């Protein structure tokens, strides 16, 4: 994580640092569109394959210790895919709430985002009810955000397609991870929300 050292220094007064907390969708974003992060001074903290449990474990190091003005949290895809064990919506939702509360306790603003659509996971095809689980988790994240006056960015709506609630093939090659075109959609939404929040 050589690049991470650049951010170990504390932000200068006028700099409003923004950290993106996530999984391979965030990691791939930084790789696919590095300029979106560089130009805006955004810091990507996406680690491929991780679930919300693992996010919570590194939240202090990867978010709080960087003293950002704001954190964008995108969690849930790998939980539903059962990457670290059986999926429990209450636990995943609880981890997202814990991250939001940790941020707030450290005077870091929060933007919560929806889980992206996925009809299935190429590495876990036996999970047949991913769309229902994703919709249910998204509804809870959105309701929590609303109740706590936290901005919520809905990536799901503009990217979902068809009765099987898939990630639109225009925006993905594998049904889970966005392509450059998919990230374009996300960038327009998140940039607006960040500017409004700061």
Explain the meaning of each model-derived region.
Residues 15-31, 48-50:
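Catalytic nucleophile-elbow at a beta strand-turn-alpha helix junction centered on a G-D-S/GDSL motif
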Residues 41-54:
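A short beta-strand-loop structural module common to alpha/beta enzyme folds
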Residues 11-13, 36:
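Short, flexible hinge/linker loops that cap or flank conserved catalytic cores
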Residues 35-40, 57-198:
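Alpha-helical cap/lid subdomain in secreted, periplasmic
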Residues 31-32, 55:
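The serine-hydrolase catalytic nucleophile loop
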Residues 26-27, 49-52, 60, 74-77:
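Alpha-helix N-cap/helix-start and coil->helix boundary motif
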Residues 20, 42-44, 152:
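Conserved beta-strand scaffold positions in the cores of enzyme catalytic domains, especially
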Residues 2-7:
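Short, small-residue-biased leader/transition segments that mark boundaries at the very start
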């Amino acid at each position: 994580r050589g690049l991470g050292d650049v951010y170990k220094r504390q932000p200068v007064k006028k700099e409003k640092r923004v950290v993106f907390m996530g999984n391979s969708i965030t990691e791939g974003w930084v790789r696919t569109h590095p300029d979106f992060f560089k130009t805006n001074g955004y810091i990507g903290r996406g680690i491929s394959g991780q679930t919300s449990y693992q996010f919570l474990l590194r939240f202090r190091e990867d978010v709080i210790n960087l003293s950002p003005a704001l954190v964008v949290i995108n969690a849930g895809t790998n939980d539903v895919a059962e990457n670290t064990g059986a999926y429990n919506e209450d636990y995943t939702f609880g981890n997202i709430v814990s991250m939001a509360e940790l941020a707030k306790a450290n005077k870091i603003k929060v933007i919560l985002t929806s889980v992206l659509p996925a009809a299935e996971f190429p590495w876990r095809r036996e999970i047949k009810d991913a769309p229902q689980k994703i919709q249910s988790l998204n509804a809870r994240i959105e309701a929590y955000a609303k109740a706590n006056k936290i901005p919520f960015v809905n990536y799901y709506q503009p990217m979902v397609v068809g009765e099987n609630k898939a990630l639109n093939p225009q925006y993905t090659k594998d049904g889970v991870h966005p392509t450059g075109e998919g990230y374009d959609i996300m960038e327009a939404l998140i940039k607006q929300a960040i500017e409004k929040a700061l």
